[in-house]
UniProtKB/Swiss-Prot annotation:
NCBIfam families xrefs: lepA, small_GTP
Subcellular location: Cell membrane
Identification of the protein by name: Elongation factor 4
Alphabetical GO biological process terms: positive regulation of translation
Similarity field: Belongs to the TRAFAC class translation factor GTPase superfamily. Classic translation factor GTPase family. LepA subfamily.
Amino acid sequence: MNLEELKKRQEKIRNFSIIAHIDHGKSTLADRILEKTETVSSREMQAQLLDSMELERERGITIKLNAIELNYTAKDGETYIFHLIDTPGHVDFTYEVSRSLAACEGAILVVDAAQGIEAQTLANVYLALDNDLEIMPIINKIDLPAADPERVRTEIEDVIGLDASEAVLASAKAGIGIEEILEQIVEKVPAPTGDVTAPLKALIFDSVYDAYRGVILQVRVMDGVVKPGDKIQLMSNSKTFDVAEVGIFTPKAVGRDFLATGDVGYIAASIKTVQDTRVGDTVTLATNPAAEPLHGYKQMNPMVFAGLYPIESNKYNDLREALEKLQLNDASLQFEPETSQALGFGFRCGFLGLLHMDVIQERLEREFNIDLIMTAPSVIYKVNLTDGESMDVSNPSEFPDPTKIATIEEPYVKAQIMVPQEFVGAVMELAQRKRGDFVTMDYIDDNRVNVIYQIPLAEIVFDFFDKLKSSTRGYASFDYELSEYRPSKLVKMDILLNGDKVDALSFIVHKDFAYERGKLIVDKLKKIIPRQQFEVPIQAAIGHKIVARTDIKALRKNVLAKCYGGDVSRKRKLLEKQKAGKKRMKSIGSVEVPQEAFLSVLSMDEE
């Protein structure tokens, strides 16, 4: 194509994404748009078409991003090129959302007509506003009996401050309002503004590993043109690759002769590892590089850590291969080998958050058939030592000797909890119990309140979300972002079985809660660990100080069963003999710890 045609084509491009809270109908709306523009034949259509991972469908969440090109002939007779970039809506994947939004000029904000605005809707809207996107509100699910579109319209205007007078009332499920949405995209979403003649700049917003072609980059071209045969360079690490193929997705990959400014598509350049291609990085040409990269790229750091161990120790290498394969598609997953006396060989893994951790664990078990034991999740603590050094510790077993520690700082998050008014008391009580500090509270409408707390991340990692849902009958929605590190009175608690430390059961706890936490755990373990032939003491210790103890009584055989009557000294001899045997057993015996014991430590609470 010559320059004129390229510029004309650029004016017809519309890049947009759909943002919504979980379950407000985002994937269904995407399905309808694909049907309406006849991108996918009705034979190939299946629900949640863009959620290609089995797990995404099952949980009804979007994890990986997908970008699709559609052609739409508008009422003005012109054919427009739409690029729909699907985003995950969950708090763990916020960075993924922000990158996919950076690849767009507009965003469709889907709000449920019955539920109204939720915490994650807000979080994602602010990301879209940060990226200067044109936001089009849509009120979805208007066919529900509980729908109240007018209330939601005023809510959008009051809480977010968007003009919702032209918000389309739609039902993605019933296919109502889809055409108006498409027309609004043409009118409201601006065309891409880049310069075709400038040096190439393309934003990587995702990367997928393909066994035959290596890493395939999903990119949005901001300036310039890229075609097969070009030599590209990644700006964060200056590595260069030769482009083998470029193309677009119509969910299937379709090769093209070039990608020009405004296009969203893929580049295959036989790149070996996803580690080279960080999401948010800028691709440019090695021969004529851009002067500076696109802004907004940041290295994603894991917030939550846990040990993963295969239940069968001979599966260790399989687990490593499985983690490496997952890492190919998920650069935010980090892992390194670690060993535990209790669990053998395994890996210490870092995750973006709890959902991310859950999803990875489930994919390992499901796609790679590896049964796992997972240790208690922990966060990164900053430990300041008495000699002036400081260190980051994410694994309780690596904590230095308590006498060498001056202070420990732990990460706090700013948690936004949206909840109906009647549950505010329950939410505040929960947040206080989790050592939260109240920040502020705003009324969204007559009934809903946005409560903001500063809560230690370590408290959220355990079971905050489940507790929040159960104390508010499922009505609360929750979003968090890391705010700062603060000094806290933290101690490391060890669990001893039969006098031996079980390293996998160690955890970090606040000093004020140490006693009750220790007592709870030893009582819980007492119920779970099967009785042995000898008595087993279970102790919770901080340093050398035992704070809680309970004993599992020994199983004993009735050695007197065959003495009918008879001399008492005969009975005593048999009992003494049994006692000596138990004693010897105790000194050499080891205790089997069942898997539930590790899990029970995770679900610690005042049950």
